[in-house]
C-alpha cells in the first residue's frame, strides 16, 4: 500500500512538472514571451487609466516594461500584427516626479532606452509618459502627455 501511494504521488509530481513546463497559462489571445504574457488593448485610454486597467485585469499586471532589443523586436512585431490601423501604444515607463527620471510601473530596472531620434524632448514641458512609436514600427519610444489617449500594452504573469 505504501509503495502504491508513493508511486501515485510521484506520478502526480511528474504531471504537475510537465504542466508547469509549458510556460503556463497565458490566455489564448495573449503573447507568451520569456515567462510573461502580453496583450495589446485597442480601447484608447489615458496613460493613468491604461495602467489602472492593467492592474485591475490581474494582480501583478502593469503596462509593459521592455528590457532588451530582442524583447522590443518581438513586441514590435506583435503590436504591428495586432494593430493593423497603426497608432501609438502606451508602455509602463513614466516620469512621475517630472524630473526626467524614467521609471517602470512594475518597478523593474531601467536598462534599455530605444528613444526615437530627438526624444525624450518634453515638448511643452508636459510629456511624462512613454509610448511605442507607430511610424517607426513600434521599435522606438516617444515621450507624450499622459493625458493623451492611446491603445496600450499590458504585461502579466498568469
Curated annotation (Swiss-Prot):
- Among the Pfam families in the record, one is Lectin_C
Residue ranges annotated as motif Mannose-binding:
119-121
Q: Where is the chain membrane-spanning?
A: none
The UniProt similarity line reads:
Belongs to the true venom lectin family.
Keyword terms of this UniProt record: Calcium, Disulfide bond, Lectin, Metal-binding, Secreted, Signal
InterPro entries noted in UniProt = C-type_lectin-like (IPR001304), C-type_lectin-like/link_sf (IPR016186), C-type_lectin/snaclec_domain (IPR050111), C-type_lectin_CS (IPR018378), CTDL_fold (IPR016187)
Tissue specificity field: Expressed by the venom gland.
Q: Is this entry keyworded Metal-binding?
A: yes
> What is the official name of this protein in its record?
C-type lectin lectoxin-Thr1
Q: Where does Ca(2+) bind?
A: 127, 142-143
Please name every pair of cysteines joined by a disulfide bond in this record.
Answer: 26-37, 54-154, 129-146
Q: Which GO terms describe its cellular component?
A: extracellular region
Q: Name one GO molecular function term.
A: metal ion binding
Compartments where found: Secreted
Name the predominant localization: secreted
Task: Tell me the function of this protein.
Answer: Mannose-binding lectin which recognizes specific carbohydrate structures and agglutinates a variety of animal cells by binding to cell-surface glycoproteins and glycolipids. May be a calcium-dependent lectin.
Signal peptide residues are 1-23
Keyword DNA repair assigned to the entry: answer is no
